[in-house]
């Protein structure tokens, strides 16, 4: 299932400053991560879905670029996002 409006607002309020703060890097990374986990589950059920696999790889690339930006701008926020989302060990 896709990302519903309720899940999206929940993620935005958890990682953003307000309910309308969608541009913050932490919010973007959290939304990308949620979409990536959903697509990963879909691809485990449908391994031959090449179009969704390409979308997944593009999302991973977008998340990587935003994380690199966040690391360059503010390393403490970067580390907090990694810890909150359990991205890297």
Swiss-Prot record:
SUPFAM superfamilies: S15/NS1 RNA-binding domain. This is Small ribosomal subunit protein uS15. Keywords: Ribonucleoprotein, Ribosomal protein, RNA-binding, rRNA-binding. Belongs to the universal ribosomal protein uS15 family. The gene is rpsO. InterPro entries: Ribosomal_uS15, Ribosomal_uS15_bac-type, uS15_NS1_RNA-bd_sf. Part of the 30S ribosomal subunit. Forms a bridge to the 50S subunit in the 70S ribosome, contacting the 23S rRNA. The lineage of its organism: Bacteria, Pseudomonadati, Chlorobiota, Chlorobiia, Chlorobiales. One of the primary rRNA binding proteins, it binds directly to 16S rRNA where it helps nucleate assembly of the platform of the 30S subunit by binding and bridging several RNA helices of the 16S rRNA.
């Amino acid at each position: 299932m896709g990302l519903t409006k309720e899940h999206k607002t929940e993620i935005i309020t958890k990682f953003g400053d307000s309910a309308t703060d969608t541009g913050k890097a932490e919010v973007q990374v959290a939304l990308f991560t949620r979409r990536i986990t959903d697509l990963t589950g879909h691809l485990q059920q449908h391994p031959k879905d090449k179009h969704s696999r390409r979308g997944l790889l593009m999302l991973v690339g977008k998340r990587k670029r935003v994380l690199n930006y966040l690391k360059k701008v503010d390393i403490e926020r970067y580390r907090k996002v990694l810890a909150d989302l359990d991205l890297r060990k």
